[in-house]
Regions:
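Secondary-structure capping and boundary motifs in well-ordered enzyme cores
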Residues: 137-145
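Hydrophobic/aromatic-rich core segments of domains that either
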Residues: 115, 147-239, 253
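N-terminal accessory/pre-domain segments preceding catalytic cores
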Residues: 1-111, 125-137, 154-155, 230-325
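Short acidic/His/Gly/Ser-rich catalytic and metal-binding motifs that mark active-site loops
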Residues: 123-126, 171-173
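Glycine-rich, acidic and aromatic/proline-enriched surface loops and short helix-turn segments
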Residues: 114-123
Length: 325
């Protein structure tokens, strides 16, 4: 049984900013549900004529784990086991060795891990579960995918942490992620932002290097933005951080998966519609990349005309949460 002191040391206990986000998100969702009972009844399930979500096939084989495989995990901060993120799990250790752990430089390995997670694992809105389940499944939320990157780095002896922030998003992703379901759209518009988004960071050669592993190249192409590389942040390109909400932490805090858990319990149909929309985005982006002549051509072309804008959301009456700089 983990002690309260250890929970606090490993940052399982939510920070003040996160608690504000969690409470504000819960109150906003409650208000949406209480004032829109008709929408909840209509949207909570998928009806017979609607498209159903089919999880994409995992595009990689699970490398075999062998006893005695080396791993660099210690009890040192940013190298140890944290909530949902066990760098000693056999699936993590085997995958880390498959990607070149202890054979490549720290930078080369972290970059390889970034590219694997970003391009091989796909976004799926689902409840939080351990990192090894994400590797077996091949899908997960942004925090599932970030946890895979962090676990791989820690397994290879590279310190890694989470960077979190409340965010709003570029218009195309707003349309796909939020506009696909009226209940989720009303929740987002009530708050003016989504509760929490994040990125991974790896400590290499004395500095923290950001790793935005959430979107595949195809989803970024569907959004009309460049394909982010290792060391490039999503903030200002894919997402826009709400001022005063950016934090770094060793672990996912308790309660982070509450939104997805609540959505699945109350309105599983809404969750399924979002996941269907994500797969439509992947298909759209794949064609855009093919028409552009490949990922490199698309990326070079898009970087020349970068100019994404946030969705227009009226925040004039959003008085529930105020964040300091």
């Amino acid at each position: 049984m983990i002690s309260f002191r250890e929970m606090k040391d490993r940052e399982y206990i939510p920070h003040k900013t996160y608690l504000k986000l969690l409470i504000g998100g819960g109150l906003s969702l409650s208000k949406v549900l209480l004032t829109n009972p008709g929408d909840l009844k209509k949207l909570r399930t998928i009806h017979g004529s609607e498209e159903r979500y089919v999880r994409p096939k995992r595009p990689y084989e699970l490398p075999p784990f062998k006893e005695g495989m080396r791993y660099g995990v210690t009890e040192e901060k940013y190298l140890r086991h944290t909530l949902y993120c066990n760098p000693c799990a056999p699936e993590v250790v085997a995958l880390a060795h498959h990607l070149g752990a202890f054979q490549k430089t720290d930078y080369e390995f972290a970059k390889t891990a970034f590219e694997f997670v970003k391009e091989k694992l796909d976004l799926e809105i689902c409840p939080m579960d351990p990192v090894e389940e994400t590797i077996r499944r091949g899908t997960g939320t942004c925090f599932h995918l970030i946890s895979v990157f962090i676990a791989l780095c820690r397994c290879a002896g590279i310190k890694a942490r989470y960077k979190t922030f409340a965010m709003n998003m570029i218009q195309t992703w707003y349309d796909a992620m939020v506009g696909s379901d009226q209940l989720v759209k009303k929740w987002y518009d009530q708050m003016g932002f989504f509760m929490m988004e994040g990125e991974g960071e790896a400590f290499i050669d004395g500095k923290w290097i950001v790793a935005h592993v959430g979107p595949t190249a195809e989803r970024q192409a569907a959004g009309g933005i460049p394909i982010t590389k290792f060391g490039e942040s999503s903030i200002g390109v894919w997402f826009f951080a709400v001022p005063g909400t950016t934090e770094t932490m060793e672990s996912i805090p308790y309660g982070l998966g509450a939104g997805a858990n609540l959505l699945k319990m109350i309105a599983p149909g809404s969750m399924e519609r979002i996941n269907i929309s994500i797969q439509h985005q992947n298909k759209m982006g794949k064609k855009i990349i093919e028409d552009a002549g490949g990922k490199e051509s698309y990326d070079a072309m898009t970087r020349k005309k970068l100019g994404s804008k946030t969705p227009i959301v009226d925040l004039s009456n959003k008085k529930g949460i105020i964040f300091g700089e």
